[in-house]
């Protein structure tokens, strides 16, 4: 009887734990900077997170989708729906350059037919099918998220929060993710959906170098070796640089928000001034006019060592069971 009760207790505990996992959709421009592939790995390796879908965004999204599918396979997660997103921003298309990380792909790295569907459609369908609100984690330009919000305005109650990597809130700087599709960014920030914005001025403190990088390189499993290969390809084009973990910090903030300190307020994206296009203007909650809601939390500080320890523990471990 005692063994039976223990089995029931463990089963109930496991079920409760599973229900508490945070359902997320990860939207990524994987293949450019190295941090996207590392962020996807962190999401897949974190038991607090239930990755319900992955979508790709901007430029050569077909090849980005192939790279994401290859990484999902190395972690045993071809069960996760994948979709190809918008290849151009809502304004001002820019001719893309081919990313070095795509060199890991071969002719055998194809994707299922379902992955050719539009990302905004997958985002909408996944949100509407979820019994509980979900967290969106966009770590590239916000084109797909803006398209989903415009195409499916009824999805807003289904979004618990958007945790994004983007912006620069303590310095005058045109951070790439926001600048690349500033119109989409303004749509997202003005949507009324709760947002946590992890900006460049905080993520720049999170470098993967020295003993930390050596620890990842020493990890002996196929997924970690794949990440190391991507780092090598990226460093070939950036020989004097070490990976900066912009996107992984946003992923971590989605399930361990205590890693960052935040401030509440409102964000406006500059879209009309040539010199300042793409800059993010933050106004703290106590300075907002009456009737204007503070829907955004911006990151102000980060526990760098705590984040790096979490990141390395997850990415050096063998791929976990889903």
Segments predicted by a language model, with ranges:
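Active-site histidine-anchored catalytic micro-motif
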Residues: 20-30, 34-70, 109-211
């Amino acid at each position: 009887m005692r063994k039976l009760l223990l089995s029931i207790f463990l089963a109930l505990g496991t079920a409760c734990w599973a229900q508490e996992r945070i359902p997320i959709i990860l939207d990524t421009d994987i293949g450019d900077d190295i941090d996207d592939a590392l962020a996807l790995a962190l999401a897949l390796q974190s038991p607090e997170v239930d990755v319900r879908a992955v979508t790709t965004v901007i430029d050569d999204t077909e090849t980005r989708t192939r790279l994401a599918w290859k990484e999902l396979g190395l972690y045993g997660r071809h069960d996760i729906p994948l979709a190809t997103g918008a290849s151009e921003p809502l304004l001002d298309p820019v001719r893309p350059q081919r990313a070095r990380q795509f060199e890991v792909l071969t002719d055998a790295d194809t994707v299922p037919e379902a992955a050719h569907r539009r990302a905004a459609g997958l985002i909408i369908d996944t949100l509407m099918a979820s019994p509980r609100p979900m967290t969106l984690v966009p770590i590239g330009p916000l084109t797909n998220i803006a398209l989903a919000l415009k195409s499916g305005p009824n999805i807003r109650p289904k979004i618990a929060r958007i945790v994004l990597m983007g912006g620069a809130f303590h310095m005058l700087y045109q951070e790439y993710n926001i600048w690349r599709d500033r119109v989409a960014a303004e749509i997202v920030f003005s949507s009324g959906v709760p947002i946590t914005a992890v900006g460049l001025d905080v993520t720049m403190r999170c470098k993967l170098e020295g003993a930390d990088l050596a620890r990842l390189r020493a990890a002996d499993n196929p997924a970690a070796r794949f990440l190391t290969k991507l780092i090598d390809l990226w460093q070939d084009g950036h020989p004097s640089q070490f990976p900066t973990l912009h996107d992984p910090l946003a992923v971590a903030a989605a399930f361990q928000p205590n890693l960052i300190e935040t401030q509440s307020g409102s964000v406006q994206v500059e879209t009309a001034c040539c010199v300042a296009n793409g800059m993010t203007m933050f106004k703290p909650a106590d300075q907002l006019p009456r009737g204007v809601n503070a829907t955004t939390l911006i990151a102000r500080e980060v526990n760098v060592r705590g984040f790096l320890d979490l990141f390395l523990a997850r990415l050096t471990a063998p791929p976990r069971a889903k």
